[in-house]
Amino acid sequence: MTAFHSPRLFLSLSLLGLLAGCGGDPKPAPPAPVVVGPAPTAAAKPLRIGIALGGGAAKGFAHIGVIKMLQANGLEPVVVSGTSAGSVVGALYASGMDAFQMQQAAVALDETSIRDMRLFSGGLVQGQALQDYVNAQLKNRPIEKLGKPFAAVSTRLEDGERTVFVRGNAGQAVRASSSIPGVFEPVTIGKFHFVDGGVVSPVPVDAARQLGADFVVAVDISSKASGKNPAGMLGIVNQSIAIMGQRLGQQELARADIVIRPKVNDIGAADSAQRNAAILEGEKAALAAMPQIKAKLAQLQQQRAAAAKAAQPAAPPCEPRSRLGRLIGRDDPCKKQE
């Protein structure tokens, strides 16, 4: 007679005997249990880089150099806002042009073709030629049909309110954003009149945030008071606007993640002959800021990843093995999670 020296073996054989003695048709096996594990970790969404391009008349060619260096380093802005000259470059960039195409367009630009000089009650330049030029470059697409989200910032003349154009006629929005008071005729849109956005938002950081940018690179090309008389009427008006918007501008710039300041103070507001020099200064300034940009982006990405991980639901509590499970030697799932 064989003795059962192992209670575990005895119990297993007893269970087999009971199952074998059961008559009737075999019942279908129940479905396999579903194992619920911890939810997969959600990857942090890629950061949306925005660029806010400030006003500065002919100094605005520097924006092209900044964009060129960002693209060369794989940091493509996907959101664009612009004030005055920044709105011109911003619209071209948002339309799908890269920095090299914009530079070609800048070099080929005949300045007289966008200056419809006539004596109007509100300014020396009507601005229709600028509007037509921008729309031609954009193939007459409205703002909402451009390749990237774009905002042109202007000032409503009736009450001084900042106005952000994100839909409609792109050329008209750029014209409104660029209508330097006393030089350009105010632009009539609906029942309101609009002038240069630099009066209320010299570098439109907030507009870039409103478009969904997580990380904003601001480009400040505004004139700084040098103690000297600015040259020409346009220089005087441009510096006057910069002084008026200086305090507001500093507050808004503080909300940017990075501020790039190309050294373009020596370039006159109307000195379009130095467009290549301005582009080069933009490249230099962006290249100098690149280590800081990359470090801040990496830091923000780490913060986002940590926040996404912390937001994941905790794993469901394990169920300890039953008495029968212990008898037949089933592994304890709770010990595996320890």
Residue ranges and their predicted role:
Residues T2-L9, L13, C22-V80, L92-E338:
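Patatin-like phospholipase
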Residues G82, G86:
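Gly/Ala-rich beta-loop-alpha elbow adjacent to hydrolase catalytic centers
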Residues S87-A91:
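Long, contiguous secondary-structure blocks with strong helical propensity
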